[in-house]
């Protein structure tokens, strides 16, 4: 049992360890899908190219499967241009975005020669991002859901619809929520260090939710707003830098 899609980032500080684990795993490189992300002070035409080279050096790998711009802060348009060049050079297999929507997404789409393949955003039954999905569908861009189970929020996990469906399908509430994501066409990143929960996260492909059940879950969307004011969040992100030396 184990994951073959690994999601890391420069700001997480674990790229060296991730690269080492991949090399020691004995698993062929083409059977592992590796995503990393660049931080705002690595964004800019000419700057991002160097950041990509440093990333590959930290990982000690020849390429990553997917590189994302972590947040819409800094010169992300210039970063995108460098990322497109890196695709042509074989350093990146694909490129995408993280936490982009509205005008920030439009900025990229206006200049993109290579369209983003994913946008990684907070997404769960209380934050379903319906408008964003409509925009991404136009360019065949997938949603990757971080915090897919709503950060373990007790109110969400005790919603009657989930308890009811859990009994019906003999599944846990997180399994019901993850199955909802799959039915919606989302790529999910359920975070857990518990072997039991990791195993449970895989056991969601032996049942399906009905259209009516999916619609009931969809109607939960306006109950809570998890994410702090987005512009304030971006100001906080802008106050943090990663090293440009390693």
List the model feature ranges, each with a label:
Residues 48-68, 85-89:
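CE4/NodB-like, metal-dependent polysaccharide N-deacetylase domain
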Residues 44-59, 78, 103-106, 127-128:
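Short, acidic/polar
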Residues 71-246:
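Beta/alpha (TIM)-barrel catalytic core signal, keyed to glycine-rich beta->alpha loops juxtaposed to Asp/Glu
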Residues 6, 64, 95:
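Glycine-centered flexible beta-alpha turn that most often forms the glycine-rich phosphate-binding loop
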Residues 29-42, 65-72, 99:
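A short, structured active-site edge motif that brings together acidic residues
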């Amino acid at each position: 049992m184990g994951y073959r899609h690994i999601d890391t980032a420069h700001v997480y500080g674990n790229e060296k360890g991730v690269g080492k684990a991949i090399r020691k795993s004995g698993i062929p490189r083409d059977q592992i899908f590796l995503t990393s992300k660049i931080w705002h002070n690595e964004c800019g035409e000419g700057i991002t190219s160097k950041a990509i080279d440093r990333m590959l050096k930290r990982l000690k790998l020849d390429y990553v499967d997917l590189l994302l711009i972590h947040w819409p802060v800094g010169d992300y348009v210039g970063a995108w241009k460098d990322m497109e060049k890196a695709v042509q050079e074989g350093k990146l297999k694909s490129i995408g975005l993280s936490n982009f929507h509205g005008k920030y997404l439009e900025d990229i789409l206006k200049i993109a020669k290579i369209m983003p393949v994913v946008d990684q955003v907070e997404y769960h039954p209380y934050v379903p991002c319906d408008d964003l999905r409509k925009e991404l569908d136009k360019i065949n861009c997938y949603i990757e859901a971080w915090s897919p189970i709503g950060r373990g929020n007790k109110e969400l996990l005790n919603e009657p619809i989930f308890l009811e469906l859990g009994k019906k399908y003999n599944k846990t509430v997180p399994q019901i929520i993850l199955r909802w994501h799959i039915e919606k066409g989302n790529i999910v990143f359920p975070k857990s260090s518990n072997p039991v929960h990791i195993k449970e996260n895989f056991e969601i492909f032996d049942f399906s939710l009905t259209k009516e059940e999916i619609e009931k879950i969809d109607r939960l969307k306006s109950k809570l707003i998890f994410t702090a004011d987005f512009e304030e969040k971006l100001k906080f992100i802008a106050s943090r830098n990663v090293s440009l030396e390693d």
